[in-house]
Amino acid sequence: MGNQMSVPQRVEDQENEPEAETYQDNASALNGVPVVVSTHTVQHLEEVDLGISVKTDNVATSSPETTEISAVADANGKNLGKEAKPEAPAAKSRFFLMLSRPVPGRTGDQAADSSLGSVKLDVSSNKAPANKDPSESWTLPVAAGPGQDTDKTPGHAPAQDKVLSAARDPTLLPPETGGAGGEAPSKPKDSSFFDKFFKLDKGQEKVPGDSQQEAKRAEHQDKVDEVPGLSGQSDDVPAGKDIVDGKEKEGQELGTADCSVPGDPEGLETAKDDSQAAAIAENNNSIMSFFKTLVSPNKAETKKDPEDTGAEKSPTTSADLKSDKANFTSQETQGAGKNSKGCNPSGHTQSVTTPEPAKEGTKEKSGPTSLPLGKLFWKKSVKEDSVPTGAEENVVCESPVEIIKSKEVESALQTVDLNEGDAAPEPTEAKLKREESKPRTSLMAFLRQMSVKGDGGITHSEEINGKDSSCQTSDSTEKTITPPEPEPTGAPQKGKEGSSKDKKSAAEMNKQKSNKQEAKEPAQCTEQATVDTNSLQNGDKLQKRPEKRQQSLGGFFKGLGPKRMLDAQVQTDPVSIGPVGKSK
């Protein structure tokens, strides 16, 4: 605290002062403890206890320093006592209390604060240097006066003592401050300045009321005893920490003097302000991070989608597709309706293959635009994903039958891509994938539903055209494809050639779907024509995508395994036949 800092200054000040006074001060310091008690008893019985507690605190800090402080305080107190004769002992006693918190520089102010001193024991010790400077510099006492007049408002003699001590102290303190006093006060000034600054900001309104309360609390020994205890602790603080502690404790101790709470409220207010500022910053950061997380997951998942068939894909895509569903539906209803009525296998390949590029586009689009909605739908989609596929179909797709059939066709095409490459082992792999992808199946099935809808899949267009039409179209595709079922053996051979071409044609359809205008019947023919050129470019991407779809749909068609394979083989031939024939 400022105590140790002020104590050496006091010693130097005492040396600067007449030695007779220092002797008297020392004598009063030695006798000061009992004398202070008596003075307090004379003026304020309540302050007597304060004086005792302060003495105990002073003794706890360091008897020599306390004696020196008391000597200085007594000298100042005596000087104050000379001018404020009746109240001088009170000033001394209060000074002593103040001295317990090194008040030597603030003698004048402390005299005024002595009333507050009982309450503001720690405050006086911390502010002692701050007020000390005012008392030392004539003009500052005036400044200190108004600052502490609020504390002195109770009208105790300390106000007069402060004025007299301010008048006296300029004479007494100049020699005292002549040495290190001038330097140390500057530090207290800084501390007191910051303290007053923050207090004026936060405690101006509190200070007058607190000063009145302090006057009352000075009358209450319990509260005063608590304050001296704080002051004693502040006295115990090392000199190195005096200034910093003075700043912190002045804020806290003044609060404790005010009620040991008001200061804390100030500290709490500061802490609250800081916490609020931090909370605002954190909120901003959290908001930014929230958007970042919303944006980055979508983007990251768009990257992951071609690689991972995990559930991450489903939530974002489902949310994105939901947000962008309206955009796709209106356009895709036109193109998809035509596609579903055109070459069904190629149309199915469109609906199957297009979803992922469209998903990526929708992710990028809806990611930034529909971040909060994406998050909400993301969570909802996850929840819906946990729902059985049938329920998902009911929820997401108005006609689950349409989706099932269309997905059977889709799965057939997808399995065609891999079956063409994998030939026979696909059934077993599909079963294993079904079992493994059970958790993912619902998610992927949900994605399929959303992708079929959002990307203008046959199901969505057929839903618009009518549930019956969807059932008919899907059934017609399956039935029309069924005749070549006896050709499964030749399918792998053609499939290998046709798979790449199917994928290529699917890629073509993806591009045309993105254009959303070329997805018409003539577009399908042109797609098959341009399959060869695009096959090299889009073949690889499509190879990965059908694998994902297989896994996702594999779990979805657990009960449809044999049917799924039949559809795959059945669709393989017609789908592959077109491009294969052209390639031939």
Swiss-Prot record:
Location of Phosphothreonine modifications: 480
GO biological process: myelination
UniProt keyword Cytoplasm, yes or no: yes
Residue span of region Disordered: 1-29, 59-280, 297-377, 415-584
Annotated segments matching region Interacts with DYNLL1 and DYNLL2: 565-584
InterPro entries membership: NABC1
Subcellular location: Cytoplasm
Basic and acidic residues bias locations: 186-226, 238-252, 300-311, 357-366, 428-439, 494-506, 541-550
Location of Phosphoserine modifications: 124, 192, 314, 381, 399, 552
Keywords: Cytoplasm, Phosphoprotein
Subunit composition and interactions: Homodimer. Interacts with DYNLL1 and DYNLL2.
Its biological purpose: Required for myelination.
Protein name: Breast carcinoma-amplified sequence 1
Organism the protein comes from: Homo sapiens
